[in-house]
């Protein structure tokens, strides 16, 4: 306690409360002073996610379409399941804080090709309908948007970046559809149309699907890298799993009640 007390002179007009694992107070300095919690909230998000989603939870990303032999007749739908660590092989090599425990988007392309697909007569359509379309938390400053977090969506590859494009698109689902199109073309699949966005009908067959690593591995990436995108998407998944609403507010409400 004496050692911790010496830290008081290093803390300005802020608030600090230290407790042990049993919830017993060790040190307090203006504990009732409201302050912005910042990234410490990620610990709470991780804790509630493990309770609501469970440690065995995995994110699913799938492709849907009408397959006729080696051809997808019409559009191929790339359907996002909220996976915040869905990345191409190249992306972690260019990140300041490389994504680890990621889900390989190339593995989905390989799974599709393994079914015999050689061409798509339409376009790759990005479907982000699992979550809402709120790209940023309204209170975020302009210095944080696009760089530290967002734009957000249930379908994001490489944090919404298209490899080779220095400008991050406003629509992460469109960026994901473009990235997946590029990957398919590089693997020898002919794609006739330009990438776009839309919603897959429930009666369109699932052709291939991939899963992320188990939730604790995703949360490890979030906490180690202090990954804002991962935290925001995990919060939306908490909302979706709790009340079928993939929104920030639904996720926050679930956290309050847990």
Question: Where in this protein do the model-derived segments appear?
Answer:
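Short, well-structured active-site flanking segments
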Residues: 51-66, 188-197
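Mid-domain, small-residue-enriched loop/turn segments at the edges of structured enzyme/sensor domains
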Residues: 14-15, 71-153, 160, 188-189, ...
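A small/polar active-site loop signature that marks catalytic segments
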Residues: 161-258
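Extracytoplasmic
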Residues: 12-14, 30-32, 38-41, 56-60, ...
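Charged, often glycine-rich, active-site loop that binds/positions anionic groups
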Residues: 29-31, 75-81, 135-142, 202-215
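Active-site loop and adjoining helix of the penicillin-binding protein/serine DD-peptidase-beta-lactamase fold
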Residues: 50-53, 98-101, 119, 164-172
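Beta-lactamase-like hydrolase cores
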Residues: 1-34, 55-56, 60, 107-117
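Active-site SXXK
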Residues: 37-55, 124, 155, 179-184, ...
């Amino acid at each position: 306690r004496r050692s911790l007390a010496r830290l008081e002179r290093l803390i300005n007009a802020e608030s600090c409360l230290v407790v042990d694992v049993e919830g017993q107070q060790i040190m307090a300095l203006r504990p009732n002073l409201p302050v912005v919690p910042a990234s410490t909230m990620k610990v709470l998000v991780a804790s509630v996610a493990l309770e609501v989603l469970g440690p065995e939870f995995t994110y699913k990303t799938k492709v849907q379409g009408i397959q006729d032999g080696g051809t997808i007749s019409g559009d191929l739908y790339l359907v996002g399941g909220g996976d915040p660590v869905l990345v191409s092989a190249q992306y972690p090599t260019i990140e300041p804080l490389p994504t680890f425990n990621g889900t390989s988007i190339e593995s989905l392309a390989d799974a599709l090709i393994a079914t015999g697909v050689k061409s798509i007569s339409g376009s790759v359509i990005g479907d982000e309908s699992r979550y809402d379309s709120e790209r940023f938390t309204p209170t975020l400053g302009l210095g944080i948007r696009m760089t530290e977090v967002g734009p957000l969506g249930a379908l994001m590859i490489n944090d919404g970046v298209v490899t080779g494009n220095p400008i991050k698109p406003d629509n992460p689902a469109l960026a994901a559809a473009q990235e997946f199109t590029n990957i398919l073309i590089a693997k020898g699949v002919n794609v006739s149309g330009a990438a776009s966005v839309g919603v897959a009908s429930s009666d369109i067959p699932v052709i291939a699907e991939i899963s992320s690593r188990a939730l604790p591995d995703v949360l490890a990436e979030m906490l180690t890298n202090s990954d804002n995108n991962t935290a925001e998407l995990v919060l939306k998944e908490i909302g979706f799993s709790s009340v079928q609403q993939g929104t920030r507010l639904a996720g926050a409400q679930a956290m309050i009640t847990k």
